[in-house]
């Protein structure tokens, strides 16, 4: 009987410790990239941020690109502070430096979520299409 009570006590203590550990996790630092899209990005990026942050698991920053057709050369992003990048973007090509940094981020284990039309963003960029699982050697 004594072992049964010890087992129950151990289970309760372990469960409480586990619950405290789970609730004490730091939010996932997230970069949401937007600014150009064939859909209403002005609304979608705000809603995406609300959904993510309301879960209590994400801390979301925005990177908003220049308007479509404008100079993109200054749109150079630092992905290093982020565990996750969410793309709500379907527009002009990024500068080569941003492309390089993005690929490096992914190759080093950075997380990526491609939201809706963002899978069409860079059809002529094979590495991006591989990230989206859209690339075939015949394409």
Where are the predicted features?
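Conserved small/polar residues in nucleotide/adenosyl-binding loops
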Residues: 135-139
């Amino acid at each position: 009987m004594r072992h049964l009570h010890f087992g129950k006590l151990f289970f309760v203590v372990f469960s409480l410790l586990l619950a405290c550990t789970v609730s004490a996790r730091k939010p996932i630092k997230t970069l949401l990239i937007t600014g150009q899209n064939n859909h209403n990005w002005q609304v979608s990026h705000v809603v995406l941020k609300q959904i993510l942050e309301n879960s209590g698991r994400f801390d979301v920053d925005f990177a908003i690109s220049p308007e479509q057709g404008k100079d993109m050369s200054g749109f150079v992003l630092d992905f290093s502070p982020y565990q996750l990048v969410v793309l709500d973007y379907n527009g002009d090509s990024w500068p080569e430096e941003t492309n390089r940094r993005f690929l490096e981020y992914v190759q080093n284990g950075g997380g990526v979520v491609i939201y809706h039309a963002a899978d069409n963003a860079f059809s002529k960029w094979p590495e991006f299409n591989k990230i989206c699982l859209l690339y075939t050697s015949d394409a």
